[in-house]
Amino acid sequence: MQVPAVLGEPIRFVLNWGRRYSLWVFNFGLACCAIEFIATSMSRHDFMRLGVIPFAHGPRQADLMVVSGTVTDKMAPAIKRLYDQMPEPKYVISFGACSNCGGPYWDSYSVTKGVDQLIPVDVYVPGCPPRPEALLHGILRLQEKIAAEEAGVGGVSRPDALASPADALPPRAADSLTAPPVRPPDPS
């Protein structure tokens, strides 16, 4: 059923308003940036006033995944599996230098060079570790992106979520993923 163009814009506005002011957050904290995430959720910064509900019970109840800290190759399948368990529309914030690009460990044999190599990222928050205000700024940027989205088909609001169905794994297929073998350091 197609919605008439006259009704499309108000419906899109109401849906996006509800999505952007009721984000349930699933924090995937891997290092010191996770401490800053906890500080942001406390009363001094209180991101619940922005409509962000911290500490969802799990990925199946979350709209937003915040990946904070160093992403190792062994942790990569777990991140992918948890992302796949989130319902559409789903959003990701990469929080801190380590999750953005590997941080100070970028040259390590066991570090993934950014979480965006595993899952699509909506907002990058730089810093080592970023201040709580930086995460609040990133959340505001994400809310602006959500407000500008088109009304999705079948619950999917981001076009890139369905762009590559070959990358979508069946529910338990991510369990069979293994970490790449340990590479010895380059002698040169």
Swiss-Prot record:
It is found in: Cell membrane. Its cofactor is [4Fe-4S] cluster. The keyword Zinc does not apply. GO terms for molecular function: 4 iron, 4 sulfur cluster binding; iron ion binding; NADH dehydrogenase (ubiquinone) activity; NADH:ubiquinone reductase (non-electrogenic) activity; quinone binding. Residues 153-188 are annotated as: Disordered. NDH-1 is composed of 14 different subunits. Subunits NuoB, C, D, E, F, and G constitute the peripheral sector of the complex. Its EC number is 7.1.1.-. NDH-1 shuttles electrons from NADH, via FMN and iron-sulfur (Fe-S) centers, to quinones in the respiratory chain. The immediate electron acceptor for the enzyme in this species is believed to be a menaquinone. Couples the redox reaction to proton translocation (for every two electrons transferred, four hydrogen ions are translocated across the cytoplasmic membrane), and thus conserves the redox energy in a proton gradient. Its main location: membrane. It is a peripheral membrane protein. Pfam families: Oxidored_q6. InterPro entries: NADH_UbQ_OxRdtase-like_20kDa, NADH_UQ_OxRdtase_20Kd_su. The lineage of its organism: Bacteria, Bacillati, Actinomycetota, Actinomycetes, Micromonosporales. It catalyses: a quinone + NADH + 5 H(+)(in) = a quinol + NAD(+) + 4 H(+)(out). [4Fe-4S] cluster binds at C32, C33, C98, C128. It is an enzyme of class 7 (translocase). This is NADH-quinone oxidoreductase subunit B 1. GO terms for biological process: aerobic respiration; electron transport coupled proton transport. GO terms for cellular component: plasma membrane; respiratory chain complex I. Belongs to the complex I 20 kDa subunit family. Keywords: 4Fe-4S, Cell membrane, Iron, Iron-sulfur, Membrane, Metal-binding, NAD, Quinone, Translocase, Transport.
